[in-house]
């Protein structure tokens, strides 16, 4: 994620150039009649990285700041935790830790905490992801100390009462039931589950329902003791001078106890929080062989028949994914551009006609096949792996046709000749769209804050937006074709040494209008994909 800076300076620079050209067009006689005006040397505009600073406290907490002026400031705490680090004992705990944020602490009751949060007049939240727990607040400049204090309290000094645990477990149970009724929410989770086989990135982000009775205060405290450590913590400030940022971080996080880092034994991470939490997931994501996770619209699969589930929509959902590149890879820019180039969306757009009309999936799929309800590319990037592919919704009975259409669109990215091959015009358009999207996203203080904190957490530094835009702009058609061939051909080699085979998640709907409908087996799906030259056998 990036933020646009210097556009006003660029405008001034263009204006100066035009003025100079105008003065140069005057005749020599006119210039000789007037004394030349005094000129002032204008310093070049500051790079945003000139305003970025990173310090490390004695206990290992990293403090990052970006002193961009504005009426609002942001403060965030990013902890290297999340579902990818969970083992069997801690499975699903990240979901509950997320929900327990901003409850009672050793200094405030839950009512006092809520009142303090409301007094900020901004936005405060906790978000759990696969690789990070993110506590963030955007508020008025004058309220930054209070916001930092509240974040520190909920991170370092939560009470976690029995009543709070009971309430959040009940809420989590309701969330789980509701999300499983929404294919657009649960199927991306199942794509990760199928691709990474219940390890690291395949661990469920949503707490499994069967785990809820086993999670209590002791389990949550074990999770916090294992991962809430200073060396795994980044405190980021947006719109705050670095000296003030260091002072606030020292005041509220400087006393976090520095302990020995998690020890690694083979491919596992040892948790020292208790005997029950003896090991965590492997630190390297791996895709183990080709996999398919069929999701029938039935309460239980019966080999002799099916029972329709009325809670599910009457559409077939299909996800086709391949292992992508890590977020630190130089090829991430090409893969993000390919994702933008494919684009896509729904057959009905609330944004009005023409929304996304120049993307490949919109023009070649949604505009061509009336039985396709939705078709969109996706790209998930993580520290050591990723997933790239297409998701689609179509009418019942069109599964085979939908799979062929998706494979055709992906294969077209790898061709060097023919009408499906990548063209310079569409590549340029995709690069411009990607840069525009990235720059506009960072107009949000919260996005800017998360960008700073996560980059320091992942890269150890803030990558300048100018550097990212330059890398996007310098991409060629050959670069995109090469990356597409590597990813879609199963040639990506990451730390986990994946198989290169495709991952398919299918939620097939039985077509009641015909008796000849036959569901595809995994062998049929796999062979169909290989026939298009995708994946590695």
Regions found by a protein language model. Give the residues of each.
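Acidic/histidine-enriched segments that form metal/cofactor-coordinating
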Residues: 2, 12-41, 76, 106, ...
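Divalent metal-coordination and catalytic microenvironments
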Residues: 60, 77, 95, 135, ...
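His/Glu-based metal-binding/catalytic segments typifying zinc-dependent metallopeptidases
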Residues: 64-69, 76-81, 261-364, 372, ...
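Non-catalytic, conformational "gating/processing" segments within enzyme and secreted inhibitor domains
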Residues: 217-255
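C-terminal regions of mature proteins
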Residues: 2-24, 28-31, 38-40, 234-236, ...
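Short, Gly/Pro- and small/polar-rich lid/capping loops
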Residues: 33-59, 65, 290-293
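M16/MPP (pitrilysin/insulinase) zinc-metallopeptidase core fold and M16-derived inactive scaffolds
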Residues: 50, 69, 74-142, 181, ...
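A common structural junction motif
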Residues: 153-160, 253-262, 408-419, 529-533
